[in-house]
Amino acid sequence: SLTFTSGNWNVAQTVTVTGVDDAVVDGSIAYTIVTAAAASVDPGYNGVNPADVSVSNTDNDAAGITVNPTSGLVTTEAGGTAQFTVVLTSQPTANVSIALSSSDLTEGTVAPASLTFTSGNWNVAQTVTVTGVNDFLDDGDIAYTIVTAAAASADPIYNGPNPADVSVSNTDNDVAGITVNPTSGLVTTEAGGPAQFTVVLTSQPTANVSIALSSSDLTEGTEAPSSLTFTSGNWNVAQTVTVT
C-alpha cells in the first residue's frame, strides 16, 4: 500500500512489480496490478479509484524431456548394470508417461518399464537401470538400444514428444571351447573293464557341432559312441564317452 500526506502528496512513490516463475509452459501471461479506491478522511480523496496497471509476464519455460547420458553405457553378460536418468524441463498440467523397452532382450533388460511424471515430481530425475543378459554365445560385445517411447499425456504440450534413446554395449563373457575331463589317468582292463570321460562345450553354438572319436589302437581299447553331437539346446550338457 501507499500513503500520501500533506507533506509528500506531490512526491511520486515507486511501485515495483516482479515476475514469478510458474514452471509451466504457458506463454506470456497478462495480469493486472489493481489499485484500490483511496481511503481518507479528506472527502475529496476518499473513494477516488486510480487506474489499474496492465502487466505481461514473459514466459521462460520450455517443454522438454532430458535423458542423461544417451550413450556410452556398458552392461556385462555377468549381469553388470548401467543407469541413466530422465527428467522434464517444465511442469506439466497433467501426468506424463514414458514407456521404456530394450531393442534386444537377449543382450539387456530395462527397469522400470515406464516412468510417470506429475506436476509434483516433474523436476526430480528418475533413474532407469539397464541389466546385461548372458546369451551364452561367443559373439563379442553387442550394441543395443533402450528405446524411450513418445510421451503420453493429457497435457497437449507433453503429449507426443519423443525423448532420446539410449545406446548401450553388452560386454561378452563367453569363449568358444571344448572341455574334456579327464584327459589322463584312465585305466581299462583286458577283462573288459571300462573307463569314462566327458565332453562339453563352453559356449552355445549357432549350429550343430560334431566331434568324431577313435582309438589309436583298436587291439587295446575301443570307444563308444564314435561321435558326439552338440546343439544349441544341449551344448552345456556333458556327454559321456566310454572306453572299453
Labelled PLM ranges:
Residues 10, 63, 123, 136-137, ...:
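Extracellular beta-strand scaffolds
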Residues 1, 102-112, 215-227:
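Short, solvent-exposed loop/linker segments at beta-strand-coil boundaries, enriched for Pro/Gly
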Residues 2-8, 54-85, 89, 112-119, ...:
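Beta-sheet-dominated interaction scaffolds and their linkers
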Residues 62, 91-93, 105, 175, ...:
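A generic structural motif
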Residues 12-41, 47-49, 55, 86, ...:
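Contiguous beta-strand segments of beta-sheet-rich domains
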